Design a protein with these regions (language model features):
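A domain-level signal for the structural core that forms small-molecule/cofactor-binding pockets
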Residues: 2-63
Length: 63
C-alpha cells in the first residue's frame, strides 16, 4: 500500500487538489502495478508563514 505525503502552500482550490490526487494515483498505479484503492495520499497544507526558503520565510519573499 503506497502512502504519499505532499506538502504544499495553502491556497489551491478543491478542483486543483482533486486533479493532483487523481493524476498522482494514476502515476503510482502504472509505475507500481497497484490498484487505485491501495494508494493513499496525504495533502498537508501550510501557510507562507510556516515555510522557509534559504532562511527567509516564504511570506516575506512574496513582498
Amino acid at each position: 500500500m503506497p502512502i504519499i505525503q505532499v506538502h504544499l502552500l495553502e491556497g489551491r482550490s478543491g478542483e486543483q487538489k482533486k486533479k493532483l490526487v487523481s493524476e498522482m494515483t494514476g502515476a503510482v498505479c502504472s509505475s507500481l502495478d497497484v490498484v487505485p484503492e491501495q494508494v493513499r495520499i496525504i495533502l498537508s497544507e501550510m501557510s507562507p508563514e510556516d515555510y522557509s526558503v534559504g532562511g527567509t520565510l516564504f511570506s516575506d519573499k512574496k513582498k
